[in-house]
């Protein structure tokens, strides 16, 4: 059962990393196109990263309760 938890965490980390990378890359592209919007984009980026990380921490906590 421990091996499945490790596999689930590995897949979750992969998803979190990809999601954050895509988010930050698109924010950087948007800021390059419209530099005057950087403040609002930065706020949205921080909120987006927080939600993505929050999803990971929910999965991390749930792996301790399963099994």
UniProtKB/Swiss-Prot annotation:
Compartment annotation: Cell membrane
Record membrane topology: Multi-pass membrane protein
Site (Reversibly protonated during proton transport): 53
Pfam families attached to this UniProt entry: ATP-synt_C
Keywords: ATP synthesis, Cell membrane, CF(0), Hydrogen ion transport, Ion transport, Lipid-binding, Membrane, Transmembrane, Transmembrane helix, Transport
TM spans (from-to): 6-26, 46-66
InterPro entries per record: ATP_synth_F0_csu, ATP_synth_F0_csu_DDCD_BS, ATP_synth_F0_csu_sf, ATPase_proteolipid_c-like_dom, F/V-ATP_Csub_sf
Cellular component per GO, a single term: proton-transporting ATP synthase complex
Cell membrane among keywords: yes
A GO molecular-function annotation: lipid binding
Note: Dicyclohexylcarbodiimide (DCDD) binding to the active glutamate residue inhibits ATPase in vitro.
Subunit structure, as described in the record: F-type ATPases have 2 components, F(1) - the catalytic core - and F(0) - the membrane proton channel. F(1) has five subunits: alpha(3), beta(3), gamma(1), delta(1), epsilon(1). F(0) has three main subunits: a(1), b(2) and c(10-14). The alpha and beta chains form an alternating ring which encloses part of the gamma chain. F(1) is attached to F(0) by a central stalk formed by the gamma and epsilon chains, while a peripheral stalk is formed by the delta and b chains.
Function (record text): F(1)F(0) ATP synthase produces ATP from ADP in the presence of a proton or sodium gradient. F-type ATPases consist of two structural domains, F(1) containing the extramembraneous catalytic core and F(0) containing the membrane proton channel, linked together by a central stalk and a peripheral stalk. During catalysis, ATP synthesis in the catalytic domain of F(1) is coupled via a rotary mechanism of the central stalk subunits to proton translocation.
Family under the similarity heading: Belongs to the ATPase C chain family.
NCBIfam families: PRK13467.1
Designated name of the protein: ATP synthase subunit c
Species of the source: Streptococcus mutans serotype c (strain ATCC 700610 / UA159)
